[in-house]
């Protein structure tokens, strides 16, 4: 079994976990919890990644929780935090989990050095001591303990509010840490919206993020039946809040690509992700494109934006027989294919 570099450095330090009830959170993307479970009293996972949740939710040995907050009761006395890409997300997870688990909770933090994991020393200062104990494979391993009473946690305090202007429309956006384009209007999404035709029927916004794309589409095309999906619990919560802030209606839910969609669509519209953590990641977008025809209605259309250097047209051509370029600039291209 091949583990990520942060998991490999953790594997060197299994003695720290002996007899502990460990709650794992953060940028975890391998099966290391199964290995860890052999060495500690119990293992549970809190994840904001729906795909990872589905991977472990059927495992009888490990309790796996998905969402923006740990709502369920937990007997964990140790947190293993895989440092996420966004510093604000790390701060969010630390604050939320320590508020839930309380004083005396031990915490181990692992992460790639280039991810900025070193900042945990300063970030954790108000909770208690935090010391670096190991480094290997360009990663660091920290141990700390919460010796102070953690402040109460309120999800609403973590939303960032900003406005997006598109033509004559002003969209109020509410976004949680770690959500794509947190605090700004993505230029790729803007070009996509400028290019879209009039929409009708059932429309899928794949990779909805903070809900900007879906909110603009619903504002301009109020009669559409809008589904908005994302793999991130932070994105789902953000999109729900953004729709609410603009008095709009849409069906927002977690889905690992098409895993939880229930119907075919007249339009699939997307600014698909290609970064997962610190690594460039294409697999979910490839699945989006490859399975699009079977998730579109007869004569349904897929329209998406991508960075110019990404080689998506051959994938689209293979499944649709064609791929049209509707618009482009020096950074992005808008592609379209019709069933």
Curated annotation (Swiss-Prot):
Name assigned to this protein = Ribosomal RNA small subunit methyltransferase C
Q: Out of the domains of life, which is the source?
A: Bacteria
User: What keywords were assigned to this record?
Assistant: Cytoplasm, Methyltransferase, rRNA processing, S-adenosyl-L-methionine, Transferase
Query: Any idea what job this protein has?
Result: Specifically methylates the guanine in position 1207 of 16S rRNA in the 30S particle.
Q: What is its main location?
A: cytoplasm
Task: Give one Pfam family.
Answer: MTS_N
Q: What Gene Ontology cellular-component terms does the record carry?
A: cytoplasm
Broad EC category:
transferase
Q: What is catalyzed by this enzyme?
A: guanosine(1207) in 16S rRNA + S-adenosyl-L-methionine = N(2)-methylguanosine(1207) in 16S rRNA + S-adenosyl-L-homocysteine + H(+)
Where is the protein localized? Cytoplasm
Q: Which family does it belong to?
A: Belongs to the methyltransferase superfamily. RsmC family.
Q: What InterPro entries does the database record attribute to this sequence?
A: DNA_methylase_N6_adenine_CS, Mtase_sm_N, rRNA_ssu_MeTfrase_C, RsmC/RlmG, SAM-dependent_MTases_sf, Small_mtfrase_dom
> Is-annotated flag, keyword Membrane?
no
Gene Ontology molecular-function annotations: 16S rRNA (guanine(1207)-N(2))-methyltransferase activity; nucleic acid binding
Q: Name the gene for this chain.
A: rsmC
């Amino acid at each position: 079994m091949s583990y990520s570099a942060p998991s490999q450095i953790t594997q060197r330090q299994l003695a720290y976990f002996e007899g502990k009830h460990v709650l794992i959170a953060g940028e975890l993307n391998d099966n290391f919890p199964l290995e860890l479970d052999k060495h500690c009293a119990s293992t549970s996972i809190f994840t904001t990644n729906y795909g990872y949740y589905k991977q472990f939710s059927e495992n009888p040995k490990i309790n796996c929780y998905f969402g923006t907050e740990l709502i369920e009761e937990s007997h964990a006395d140790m947190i293993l935090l895989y440092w996420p890409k966004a510093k604000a997300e790390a701060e969010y997870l630390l604050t939320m989990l320590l508020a839930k688990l309380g004083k005396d909770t031990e915490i181990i933090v692992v992460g790639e050095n280039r991810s900025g994991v070193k900042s945990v020393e300063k970030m954790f200062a108000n909770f208690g001591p935090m010391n670096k104990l190991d480094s290997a494979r360009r990663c660091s391993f920290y141990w700390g303990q919460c010796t102070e009473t953690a402040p109460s946690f309120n999800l609403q305090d973590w939303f960032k509010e900003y406005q997006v202007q598109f033509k004559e429309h002003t969209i109020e956006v509410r976004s949680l840490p770690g959500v794509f384009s947190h605090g700004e209007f993505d230029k790729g999404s803007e070009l996509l919206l400028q290019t879209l035709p009039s929409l009708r029927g059932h429309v899928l916004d794949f990779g909805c993020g903070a809900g900007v794309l879906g909110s603009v589409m619903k504002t301009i095309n109020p009669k559409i039946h809008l589904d908005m999906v994302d793999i991130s619990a932070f994105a789902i919560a953000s999109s729900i809040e953004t729709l609410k802030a603009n008095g709009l209606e849409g069906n927002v839910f977690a889905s690992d690509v098409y895993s939880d969609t229930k119907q075919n669509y007249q339009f699939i519209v997307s600014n698909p992700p290609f970064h997962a953590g610190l690594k460039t990641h294409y697999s979910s977008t490839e699945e989006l494109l490859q399975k699009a025809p079977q998730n579109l209605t007869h004569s349904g259309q897929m329209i998406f934006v991508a960075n110019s250097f990404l080689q998506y047209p051959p994938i689209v051509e293979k499944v649709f027989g064609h791929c049209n370029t509707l618009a482009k600039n020096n950074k992005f291209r808008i592609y379209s294919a019709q069933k």
